[in-house]
């Protein structure tokens, strides 16, 4: 009876929109064939309560589904009563009160039928509520479990698995793929059972009431079913491909947003946008093909449906005329079968959601079931109460799983006695850090053994083993929480006193106490609020608080400035007492006190002994020391004499300089410090309030270039909508034929109407295909456009926007993935349905008023109730959608952080802690799903039951109008079917309410992003583009605070000048504003007062793209992209195509060429996520090559050599010296030996210049610089 059902069912695209989350390439090859799990396996995480919910939900869905066919029995009997009485009411009105009063009999009969209808309505009201709410409840409970299990499974995996999988993809799986499962196991399953029950009940009623007609109709239904099956198969293939393309796009976006400073500094926005658009374009093409194939099958389905009407009416009329059936019987059979067949169409979106869920679950469950070889959650293995700490590596061979063909360790042998300190030295990439990772059992060696106290570490319990070990690595990772919490990650049950003790030992207490919120200061995303030195000291405190038996220091002091280093080194020396310590250091001055120094070369240890023994050997260590001391020799000689005088002063500088090691900023800019989550929530709520709602037309305007598609699509939709009232007219005419009259005339009329039905079928084939295709294509184009615009708008924003915690990488990636898809959910195919349904109801109402205005008015008075139910549903679901989104983002943030920094989480054995935080954040979304279940259940059941009640009212009132001669029976049928079918169609349109609610919210977010004017617009073409630039830079009384922590002053009237071709060195304690100078020069921010001038022109007046193109930057922790080495180097100049020769030349200048040539794929070698496949030194040299390729006028070196080992440092330093020739250069360095030759050295303290001059002049002043050199020379010349 309800054409819409089929249209809606077959056409409705899943609103989850086949989003991100591909299967990585390697696994995609293997999984081409089998990428669905069994249908029942999908529910493997349901407990008895869920099963009970699902069972009751299914039972009620079946009861609900049987309602319509049962109603058709009542309808058939009622039709017979009407047709039998039709002759009695063709007289004028005043005759109707005859002796027998057939009118009263008819009205009594109708009252009885009205009770039947109402009874069915009451049953449906209850059943529909239980069906929807119980299935939604069960899904919410299971999804919570799946999220927990999946996150648990990820945290459980070993490092080699992450190297191959890549972390970005896991984040998209955690959000998108699980919401796909949620789509496939919730209310849609209930709807599916409801549809199936309708199908079976319809056919059972059909067979009982008239098997001959049923068989005829079934023949065509079978063909229809077959075509649907074929279509579903084609569709799922396209969905798979589309998923993969979107996942790749998602990974590009996440990578670019995570490295936004690098992207902006090198003007890589367009390149990132192109990479992103390339994957989107693929997804769009697949989406359009999907729309074409889907809508051809849609058209065929409608052609078959109308053909079956034609056949059924023709054959049915023959049976009625030959008195085998009554007309009521024929109607019951026809409509029962029709409703049954259409219910299959209604099941389509559910059928669609199910394979999607099974596909997503295949990957998710696969990861959940993957048992790692090294399982940190396992309880198995030896758990000693304590260990002595004797370590031994015997004949250890190893290569990383992701690059199995490159051997790192080639037979390593090393013994470390309990309490000894062993230093590993050697060139970048020789296997030192690998040794440390193997000792923590992040990987297992391919051959050989590693033992502690004579026990193979594989026999220890993994967690227990790691708890004995404290690690401080070169680029320490802090989590986005408070300082105290970060230290607590070292050991869960630590007290505040122990934290303070550890912080004092790590020399971080003073700077923490100067922060406004002290230990409650938030450190920002990846610790971005703090300087490198401050992060490093907090990481040391975090390691010390574990009180580990074995301490692993991988370049633990490389990021510190001189003063901090001396003190932290002292702290580490103290921390090493009584512990077995392995130190990796490039600065050899820090390891000369080690008990044993082991020289690494090419994956084996070639020499070991104490400092003096190895110097005598004149081997690799001797060579490294020689290279290093040549730099610091000058320092130490100058100070031999003065050191004795200075000893008493202890190197304390004037102005209490040492007391003010306070770092406001750097490396990454400040993100504001907020102590408590609830304040954060208040702000997020404000953010939502500040996003102005967007009108629907504004979204459509984005699609305006596709207007021809919309015109064609809308015309077809209107034509399709008008089909239904046309159907009503023919139906009422056909019923009227069977009153008293000549059989031959009846047969002729029936034949004619059957042919009309066939004509409607041919018409609907074309209109349905065109409607679906035009809107589908426009929708795909819109999604691509929105994603592309959103990504472009994000890349356009200024740094202060990215500093805001609401715009963390995780949150932005999630937005990008879901918002555009949700907007498409309310446009595209959905728009076509709304146009079609509106036309349907509109035409229906007009015709109804013509044929019977009284009944029309009664029926129309019911429609507002249905509409109100729809609006209430929409409003409540929208509120839920908003809350859901926000709360899932909070959980997503924790997950993203844990997955991105998995090494740190694992080293700290904090997997359980992150898991419990994540689980806690899932409570909110779960509570929402419970609330939603009930609201959705109530509104759904009201809209479902209304139809039954309207049948009761309509036919009772209809009989009154017939008895009183106001209407004929066929007009009652016409009016009723036109209005009810139209209203049902509108009901279907309102079932998209949740999608529309989500879409409006997403559209509002997107438009607020598109319309945000950044303070510094990276895309701007405004400003001057000077023809030549000499390279002189002046800072004039510059005052600056970071926007997100406006109350902490950073620069307080800084003035400095560097002339063309000069090298300026900035020195000072951590946090004095050195890196801020570089960021202001790059125009990441603008000063609050004062000016920055380039060649005398104010930076604000210069075009920002031109300005950045003149600067080449190399920072302390360089970020590389997950592509080939060649592409990473070429990234330095995105304004043109860089030739391979230039890439090789830059690599040679940066001294990385020889290393690249040793790799199997040379320049085409992928560097891994954030460059993880390379050592610190290798990454740094690629970053230098990247800066040189753009031939900058000004070179900015922010700690460019701090991460390098001696040999690399010497060579890179030479490369930098060569690169500086003829260029203006600004260097930030903690190692003073690297800057002695600078033309000008400026000492910054508290945001102002305190001293400036050459190395010699500053030594003569005996001020801050003198103290710093003194301290450093002291450590170097022990």
Curated annotation (Swiss-Prot):
Protein name: Phosphatidylcholine translocator ABCB4
PTM-bearing positions, type Phosphoserine: 24
Residues engaged in binding ATP 2: 533, 1045, 1070-1076, 1116
Provenance organism: Rattus norvegicus
Pfam families per record: ABC_membrane (PF00664), ABC_tran (PF00005)
Entry's transmembrane regions: 48-70, 116-136, 186-207, 215-235, 294-315, 330-351, 711-731, 755-775, 831-851, 853-872, 933-955, 972-993
Region (Interaction with HAX1), start-end ranges: 622-646
Cellular component aspect of the GO annotation: apical plasma membrane; clathrin-coated vesicle; cytoplasm; Golgi membrane; intercellular canaliculus; membrane; membrane raft; plasma membrane
Family classification: Belongs to the ABC transporter superfamily. ABCB family. Multidrug resistance exporter (TC 3.A.1.201) subfamily.
PTM (free text): Phosphorylated. Phosphorylation is required for PC efflux activity. Phosphorylation occurs on serine and threonine residues in a protein kinase A- or C-dependent manner. May be phosphorylated on Thr-41 and Ser-46. Glycosylated.
Residue ranges occupied by any ABC transporter domain in the UniProt entry: 391-627, 1033-1271
UniProt entry keywords in alphabetical sequence: ATP-binding, Cell membrane, Cytoplasm, Cytoplasmic vesicle, Glycoprotein, Lipid transport, Membrane, Nucleotide-binding, Phosphoprotein, Repeat, Translocase, Transmembrane, Transmembrane helix, Transport
Glycan-carrying positions: 88, 94
Residues in ABC transmembrane type-1 domain copies: 54-356, 710-998
Reaction(s) the record says it catalyses: ATP + H2O + phospholipidSide 1 = ADP + phosphate + phospholipidSide 2; a 1,2-diacyl-sn-glycero-3-phosphocholine(in) + ATP + H2O = a 1,2-diacyl-sn-glycero-3-phosphocholine(out) + ADP + phosphate + H(+); a 1,2-diacyl-sn-glycero-3-phosphoethanolamine(in) + ATP + H2O = a 1,2-diacyl-sn-glycero-3-phosphoethanolamine(out) + ADP + phosphate + H(+); a sphingomyelin(in) + ATP + H2O = a sphingomyelin(out) + ADP + phosphate + H(+)
